[in-house]
C-alpha cells in the first residue's frame, strides 16, 4: 500500500499543477477552437492535424498539406513529432480534425512531477518532504510561461537528463543517454540542445578520468539515434532562411529573481514587462520559495555548514559548468539586460547572427542551469535536519508568490470554455469555399498579419484535405520561400490559379486587376475559385464538416 501511495501522490501533484495552470476544457480532442486564436500553439495543432490527416506512412515525420506542395517536417511547425508518431498508427480510427495539445499539456505536468519526485525522493527524510521537494521542482515559472509553445512544455526532459547525470552508474550508460536524446529530438530542437548540455557534462567527467577515458569515447554512440532523427526531420538539409533576429529574445542578467512581468509575482519586485523577448523567452524566474532555498544553499556552502552527503553529490554538478557557461553567453546575447535595460550593446557580424539563427530564442538556453540550481537547492534543504519544515515553508512561499502568474496564464486558456470552433470565420460558407478549392493561398504570405484568420481557414483546409500554399514555420527552406514569393508575384500581377482560394489578410488592397473579384465574408476578403478542384486524396478517414 505504501509503495502504491508514492506514484499516486506524484500523479495527484501533476494533476493539481495542470489544473492550476490550464482549464480542464482544453482536454477533449473535439474542443479545437481555443487553439485557433492566432497563437503559436495553433501552429502546433495544425501541423499535427495535417500529419494525421495526410502524412506519409509511419514513421515518416513530414506532412504534405501545409506549405504545399513541398510540405514540411513536424519539427518545423513545433508539432511534437513524438506525439505524431504515437498517434499515427491510430489515425484511421481517430476523428478527423481532433486536437491533442490539451492532453499533451497534462502529460507534461504528470511526467514533470514524476521525474521531480525521482530526483528528490532518495534525499528526503520522509514522504511529505519528498512531495514538497517534487512540488517545488514542478512549480517552475519557466514551465508555466511556455503555455503558448506546447512542445517546449516538455521540460521533464531536462529533469530526466539530470536524473541520469546525477547517478554515476546511469551517467556512464550510453543507453540512458540515447533514450533521452532520442526522445528530445522527437519533441523540440531547443530541448535536444539542453539535454546535450547534461550529456556533455557526463562525458567531460569521464574524459577527465584516465580509467574511464577509453570507454567514455564509446559514449558518443549515444548521439546516433538523435542524429538520425534530426536527419529525418531534414534539420541537416536546407538551406534555410535566416530571420536575423538573434539577440532579440535574451535572458537578462537578473532573470533568476526578476520575472520582468509585474503580473507574475506577488512578493518580489519586477521590472516592467518590456519587449516580448525579455519577458517571455527570457523568463528564468525561480519564484520566491525556490529563491529562498537557493540563497540558503549559497549561505550554507559559503559558511561550510552544508552536510557532507549532499555536498559530495552536488559537487558533481560542477562538470555541467562549461556547457552551462557557453549556453549563458548565447542566452544573454550581445546586449546584456539589467532591470529591463541594456547595459551595453555589441555589434555582431551578420555571418555570426545568421549562424546563431537556429537558437534565436536564446533566452531559453538558461533553463538547464535554472533547473540544476533549483534541484541543488531542494536537495540541500531535503538533507537538512529540518527538511520537512524548510521544504514545506518554501513551497508555501512559492505558491503565494506565483499565484498571480498561474491565474494570468490560466486565463489564457479561457477560450476553451467556448465550444465554438470558429470565431473569425464563423460563416459555414467558408467550409464550402475551402472544400471546392484545389488549394488555399494567403496574401500576404506572412504569419502575423492576421494569424487567427490564417489558422481558422487552414484548419478547414486540413480537415477537407486541401493543400495550403503558405503556412507559418519555425524554419523555412529557401526553396519554399522562393516558391511562395513566386506565388505572391503572380498574384500581384493579377494572374490567378482558377482552382485556388485566395484569402486576403489585413487591409492591404488587392491588385487593381483583381479588385472586382474580391468578396467578403465575416469581414475577411477573399477571391473564390472559379473552377472546382478534383477530389482530395488523404490517407486517413474521410473528411468531416467542421
Residue spans for each PLM region:
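Start-transfer (signal-anchor) and selected internal transmembrane alpha helices
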Residues: 1-32, 217-221, 306-323
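Membrane-interface coil-to-helix junctions
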Residues: 17-111, 140, 144, 260-262
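Membrane-interface helix-loop junctions at the exits of transmembrane helices
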Residues: 20-25, 133, 139-147, 230-238, ...
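Periplasmic/ER-lumenal interhelical loops and adjacent helix-loop junctions
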Residues: 38-39, 226-301
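Membrane-interface micro-motifs in multi-pass membrane enzymes
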Residues: 75-80, 99-109, 136-160, 186-190, ...
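Membrane-embedded helix bundles of polyisoprenyl
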Residues: 106-123, 128-168, 173-206, 220-229, ...
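Signature aromatic-anchored transmembrane alpha helix within multi-pass, membrane-resident enzymes
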Residues: 219-223, 325, 375, 381-409
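Extracytoplasmic
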Residues: 402-546
Amino acid at each position: 500500500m505504501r509503495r502504491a501511495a508514492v506514484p499516486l501522490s506524484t500523479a495527484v501533484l501533476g494533476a493539481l499543477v495542470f489544473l492550476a495552470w490550464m482549464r480542464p476544457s482544453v482536454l477533449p480532442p473535439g474542443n479545437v477552437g481555443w487553439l485557433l486564436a492566432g497563437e503559436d500553439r495553433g501552429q502546433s495543432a495544425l501541423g499535427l492535424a495535417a500529419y494525421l490527416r495526410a502524412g506519409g506512412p509511419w514513421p515518416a515525420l513530414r506532412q504534405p498539406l501545409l506549405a504545399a506542395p513541398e510540405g514540411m517536417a513536424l519539427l518545423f511547425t513545433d508539432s511534437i513529432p513524438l506525439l505524431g508518431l504515437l498517434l499515427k498508427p491510430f489515425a484511421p480510427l481517430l476523428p478527423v480534425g481532433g486536437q491533442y495539445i490539451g492532453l499533451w499539456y497534462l502529460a507534461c505536468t504528470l511526467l514533470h512531477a514524476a521525474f521531480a519526485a525521482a530526483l528528490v525522493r532518495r534525499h528526503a527524510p520522509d514522504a511529505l518532504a519528498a512531495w514538497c521537494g517534487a512540488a517545488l521542482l514542478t512549480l517552475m515559472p519557466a514551465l508555466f510561461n511556455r503555455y503558448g509553445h506546447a512542445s517546449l512544455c516538455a521540460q521533464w526532459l531536462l529533469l530526466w537528463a539530470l536524473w541520469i547525470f546525477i547517478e554515476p552508474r546511469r551517467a556512464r550508460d550510453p543507453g540512458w543517454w540515447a533514450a533521452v536524446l532520442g526522445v528530445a529530438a522527437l519533441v523540440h530542437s531547443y530541448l535536444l540542445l539542453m539535454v546535450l548540455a547534461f550529456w556533455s557534462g557526463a562525458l567531460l567527467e569521464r574524459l577527465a578520468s584516465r580509467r574511464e577515458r577509453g570507454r567514455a569515447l564509446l559514449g558518443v554512440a549515444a548521439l546516433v539515434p538523435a542524429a538520425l532523427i534530426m536527419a529525418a526531420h531534414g534539420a541537416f538539409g536546407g538551406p534555410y532562411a535566416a530571420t536575423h533576429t538573434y539577440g532579440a529574445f535574451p535572458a537578462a542578467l537578473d532573470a533568476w529573481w526578476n520575472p520582468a512581468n509585474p503580473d507574475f509575482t506577488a512578493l518580489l519586485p519586477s521590472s516592467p514587462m518590456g519587449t516580448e523577448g525579455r519577458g517571455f523567452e527570457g523568463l528564468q524566474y525561480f519564484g520566491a520559495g525556490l529563491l529562498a532555498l537557493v540563497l540558503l544553499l549559497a549561505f550554507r556552502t559559503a559558511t561550510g555548514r552544508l552536510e557532507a552527503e549532499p555536498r559530495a553529490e552536488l559537487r558533481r554538478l560542477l562538470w555541467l559548468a562549461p556547457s552551462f557557461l557557453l549556453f549563458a553567453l548565447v542566452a544573454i546575447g550581445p546586449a546584456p539586460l539589467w532591470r529591463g535595460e541594456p547595459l551595453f550593446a555589441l555589434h555582431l557580424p551578420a555571418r555570426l547572427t545568421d549562424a546563431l539563427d537556429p537558437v534565436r530564442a536564446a533566452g531559453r538556453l538558461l533553463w538547464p542551469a535554472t533547473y540544476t540550481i533549483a534541484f541543488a537547492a531542494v536537495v540541500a534543504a531535503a538533507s537538512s535536519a529540518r527538511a520537512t519544515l524548510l521544504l514545506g515553508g518554501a513551497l508555501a512561499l512559492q505558491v503565494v508568490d506565483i499565484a498571480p502568474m498561474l491565474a494570468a496564464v490560466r486565463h489564457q486558456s479561457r477560450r476553451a470554455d467556448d465550444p465554438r470552433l470558429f470565431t473569425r470565420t464563423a460563416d459555414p460558407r467558408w467550409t464550402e469555399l475551402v472544400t471546392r478549392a484545389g488549394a488555399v493561398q494567403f496574401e500576404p504570405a506572412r504569419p502575423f498579419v492576421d494569424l487567427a484568420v490564417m489558422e481558422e481557414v487552414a484548419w478547414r483546409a486540413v480537415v477537407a484535405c486541401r493543400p495550403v500554399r503558405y503556412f507559418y514555420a519555425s524554419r523555412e527552406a529557401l526553396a519554399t520561400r522562393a516558391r511562395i514569393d513566386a506565388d505572391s508575384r503572380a498574384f500581384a500581377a493579377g494572374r490567378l490559379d482558377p482552382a485556388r482560394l485566395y484569402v486576403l489578410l489585413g487591409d492591404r488592397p488587392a491588385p487593381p486587376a483583381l479588385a472586382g473579384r474580391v468578396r467578403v465574408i465575416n469581414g475577411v476578403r477573399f477571391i473564390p475559385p472559379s473552377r472546382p478542384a478534383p477530389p482530395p486524396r488523404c490517407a486517413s478517414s474521410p473528411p468531416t464538416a467542421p
